[in-house]
Amino acid sequence: MVERAASSAADAVFLDLEDAVPVGDKQQALLTAVDAIERLDWGRKTVTVRINAIGSPFIEHEVHRLAGLSRLDAVLLPKAERVGDVSALGETLATHRGNRSEALDLELLIETALGVVNVDALAAAHPSVSALHFGVGDFSASIGARSNEIGLSPRDYSHTGAAADNHVETPQDLFAYPMMRILIAARAFNLRAIDGPFGAFRDSKGTMSSAVKAAAMGYDGKQIIHPLYCFV
């Protein structure tokens, strides 16, 4: 699977050490990620690793092991919420950069209510912060939304209608506010804004609609689950 990602048409790839990895497999996942980063030909892709969250027993070792890799471009911090944590992580990346001329970039996954509330301060928390991602799945859980699919509003959530011709309803209206908050913070601090994935990846129409909406809002990119959609 990692080899397919390296040879895909994607502009960027992130290797996951967090949600996709069971607790008992964390160490092996880190070793696999390091091997792939150093061994595979990634071309001109941006290569990122999603590390575990602040407070995890795994994050310190992950950061120390990844910080000096020459072919790695960034780490993605999930559940970013507090300025002090982001600032400290940025300093750790700089301290452990080894022979790199510059420290790794730090990308932030905004996926909780507190993260959205603090997003402006998080965007400015450290000079290494380069991008803000919207984590729609965990955000839904954070606010108590009854969503069945990542990236879709709950079935019971709908507008009653409006007379205005320019009123547009989409399945993602529930997420318009956090998406805009994240986008505004990214633009204010000259960062990239990346939308989260559309969970029902076999639904090509839904995936396209989700990507088009994010692009229309001004987002710079979108996470995808399947390489089939790299052309979007």
Label every PLM stretch briefly.
Residues M1-V232:
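Expand to "…catalyze enediolate/carbanion chemistry for C-C bond making/breaking, isomerization
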